[in-house]
């Protein structure tokens, strides 16, 4: 299961969805795409405070006026959690 902890300017994800074999899991791919897009956007707009993305784990923190970007990613994660129960869990804020 992928666990997502999302705040206004920080989001951490860990784990694996277990929806399909490694390299074929669309849920893991979707979560990764959201996290890479957020990291890229924050870097491009010079709002990245810190990012750590590796296999099975990502932790991204923003600076400045980046709340909308984090809200967008959280919304995407919530939609994945609803579409794939048992694969993605949103934990607190």
PLM-predicted stretches and their roles:
Residues 1-26, 35-93:
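N-terminal intrinsically disordered, cationic/polar leader segments
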